[in-house]
A protein has these predicted regions:
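Beta-rich carbohydrate-recognition modules and glycan-binding surfaces
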Residues: 1-159
Length: 159
């Protein structure tokens, strides 16, 4: 099953709403905190100009997730709501995804997000995710004007 502790951070890429004309700004950096590599997503999320997101995303096309039941993330941050976005072979358009939210505080916590509870972004998508069809995962600050500051220690799929 998939587990990532950011030891190979070249597999993750930063994406913002500027790809569609938005004005959100941000970046990802990798820090070592107590011997762990931490992905830090920071920025200013703006809904101006039809925008409203910054994220880091990783391709999962070559990973067998057929038996996955949940996404587990260990994270902390600035007491804001963040999201995990999953894309599948059925999310053809760039704005299609399945989402689940979690709210962080100033200490690292483990969040378990059942795949069956991810919500589709539009009516054209299947109601539920087939785990073997997952093609990417995104860690996302989304949907409202806010400052993002999210520290992620680990993310994985579990049975």
């Amino acid at each position: 099953m998939f587990k990532d502790n950011f030891s190979n951070n070249e597999q993750w890429r930063y994406v913002a709403d500027d790809v569609m004309g938005g004005v959100s700004t941000g970046y990802v950096e990798y820090q070592i905190i107590e011997e762990d590599i931490i992905a830090v997503l920071k920025g200013n999320v703006s809904t101006e100009n039809n925008g409203g997101f910054i994220q880091i995303r990783r391709d999962l096309k070559d990973i067998n997730l057929e038996n996955a039941n949940s996404v587990k993330i260990v994270a902390k941050g600035n007491s804001q709501k963040y999201y995990i976005f999953l894309r599948t072979t059925g999310t053809i358009l760039p704005w299609q995804y399945y989402a689940s939210e979690f709210t962080v505080n100033e200490i690292f916590n483990e969040f378990v997000l059942p795949i069956k509870d991810f919500e589709k972004s539009g009516f054209l998508l299947a109601k539920k995710i087939n785990p073997k069809k997952i093609t990417s995962i995104g860690i996302v600050a989304f949907g409202r004007d806010h400052l993002a500051e999210l520290y992620v220690k680990e993310i994985k799929f579990t049975k």
